């Protein structure tokens, strides 16, 4: 009798498992079913289990249940890999000539910083690069094609920085180009990656792209009148990492940015130039910043940028971070003493055909 009860219990258990499998094989409404190949593999495994049960097998039938999952897994593995989805087509075809790169500097850094940029990334992109400084330098004009003396103060003050940004904005509008990109004199710009990024967005739409340096919106006080203040908060892309603005958006900024308006707008919130850009775009115009981790400033730990990903970055930087030297961590033909910024090593990685780059170097 015990043997008969055990047989009934076993058959009941196998029958329940079979029913569960049938339920699993039925595609619920609103959910995608198995791929054709997977469904075929699952069906074959299920048929094997059904055949074993029909043949009156007991314990072997239980092994068939486990075998079903093995067969289903094999069916999944044997399916050809799905082809990678095609890359998103560019919104429009642009060339470096469509981009206006403004490099903000000061006369005391013409040799210490600008010479490095002129030897590296600017050397291949002179027509699209415009250097905004605060003093005359005939030697610099011989090396760079577009040098603009803003006649702004050389001080690193809110007013001086906003003065230069105002000139940058006006010169961009005059240029008729599609994209305005601002960087500092301690940035390396990978122009190929920059152009590829910008081509993903129509320049006629409202595009503001860069990286914030804060983990929350900045809070400021907007001066409405002599005695009335209004709190505002907004995101802004830090100028130290670089940022880009489409022409469509730049034109909308005109009432608050063109002519002398940019400086008066900056005074209204009493914040520096990059914050003022964010204020106009996010707080006044209601356009959101598009964050991109491809922009980098010296305010972040640059050692965390993988060497294998350097060619994908838009901007890099160097400086000090937590009282330590902060630059891209990579090997190259130049020692850290010879190339403390690592910009020369990065440039040779991206452009090994550069005449001064050593050949046969593993980066």
From Swiss-Prot:
Q: Matching InterPro entries, A to Z? A: Fringe, Fringe-like_glycosylTrfase
Membrane topology annotation: Single-pass type II membrane protein
- What about PTM? A soluble form may be derived from the membrane form by proteolytic processing.
Q: Where does Mn(2+) bind?
A: 186, 298
Q: Where is this site: Cleavage?
A: 77-78
User: Got any disulfides in this one, which pairs?
Assistant: 152-163, 181-244, 348-357
Task: Kindly identify the residues recorded as the active site.
Answer: 274
Q: Where are the transmembrane segments?
A: 9-29
Q: Where in the cell is it found?
A: Golgi apparatus membrane
Could you list this entry's UniProt keywords, alphabetically sorted: Developmental protein, Disulfide bond, Glycoprotein, Glycosyltransferase, Golgi apparatus, Manganese, Membrane, Metal-binding, Signal-anchor, Transferase, Transmembrane, Transmembrane helix
EC code: 2.4.1.222
Tell me the cofactor note.
Answer: Manganese is the most effective. Can also use cobalt with lower efficiency. Has some activity with magnesium and calcium, but not zinc.
Q: Name one GO biological process term.
A: regulation of Notch signaling pathway
Residues listed as glycosylation sites in the UniProt record: 151
Predominant location: Golgi
Q: Which GO terms describe its cellular component?
A: Golgi membrane
Q: Which of the residues are on side Cytoplasmic? A: 1-8
Q: What class of enzyme is it?
A: transferase
Lumenal side residue ranges read: 30-363
Family (UniProt): Belongs to the glycosyltransferase 31 family.
What does the function comment of this entry state?
Glycosyltransferase that initiates the elongation of O-linked fucose residues attached to EGF-like repeats in the extracellular domain of Notch molecules. Essential mediator of somite segmentation and patterning.
Query: What name is this protein filed under?
Result: Beta-1,3-N-acetylglucosaminyltransferase lunatic fringe
